[in-house]
């Protein structure tokens, strides 16, 4: 990746949507990040809402175009992004921090970060990607979200959100240089996988007994279900 341009806004419905709008109007170029103090329509995987207090957390989206990226290697983007966010969070806390498949980050068994990746595909190639990331930095109260946490909640230390952003950009640069190295990215991802070899986990909202074996090259997770 080349130098990343940072655009800061006070508030927006969604940093992903804001980026997409700017891309369509041709007002931004490759390797641009939008960072917001607040977003009032943020969402995560499966259209779940992402709630964040004003100015307390890192809310950002990266626009990137990877030349000649085949659709068959699409999961490499998720691997690289998940590892980038994981490494960023681990920079600031000592608690156990892992990737919950497909791309949530958990610290001390609670969600500290969420990722939403939107890819445009043309002629079996990834035309561009918008990578939305939320990292809970200084927020202490999470109404109706008992399984959420933040860096400050775990360390009792206030952080400048921009410092977290710059660390994330540094890690994006590191892992996107390895974007075509599926073996490296997948090994790193599996080494940091939450619930690996675990005997109980949630599957489609139900607690089942089984064992998470690993994540595969296509991004799917291999699970061994124990018979009753």
Predicted regions and their residues:
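Long, positively charged amphipathic alpha-helical accessory segments at protein N-termini or as interdomain linkers
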Residues: 5, 67-72, 76-97, 107-228
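Short loop/edge segments at beta-strand edges and connector loops
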Residues: 10, 99-101
């Amino acid at each position: 990746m080349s130098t990343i341009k940072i655009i800061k806004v006070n508030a927006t419905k969604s940093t992903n949507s804001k980026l997409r709008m700017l891309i369509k109007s041709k007002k931004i170029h490759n390797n641009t990040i939008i960072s917001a103090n607040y977003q009032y329509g943020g969402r995560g995987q499966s259209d779940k809402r992402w709630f964040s207090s004003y100015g307390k957390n890192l809310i950002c989206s990266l626009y990137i175009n990877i030349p000649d990226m085949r659709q068959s290697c699409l999961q490499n983007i998720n691997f690289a992004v998940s590892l980038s966010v994981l490494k960023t969070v681990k920079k600031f806390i000592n608690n156990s921090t892992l990737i919950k498949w497909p791309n949530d980050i958990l610290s001390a068994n609670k969600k500290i970060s969420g990722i939403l990746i939107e890819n445009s595909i043309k002629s079996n190639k990834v035309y561009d990607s918008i990578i939305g990331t939320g990292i809970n930095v200084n927020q202490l109260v999470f109404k109706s979200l008992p399984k959420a946490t933040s860096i400050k909640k775990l360390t009792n230390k206030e952080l400048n959100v921009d410092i977290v952003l710059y660390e994330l950009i540094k890690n994006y640069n590191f892992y996107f240089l390895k974007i075509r190295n599926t073996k490296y990215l997948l090994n790193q991802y599996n080494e940091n996988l939450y619930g690996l070899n675990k005997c109980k986990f949630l599957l489609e909202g139900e607690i089942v007994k089984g064992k998470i074996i690993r994540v595969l090259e296509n991004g799917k997770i291999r699970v061994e279900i124990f018979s009753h």
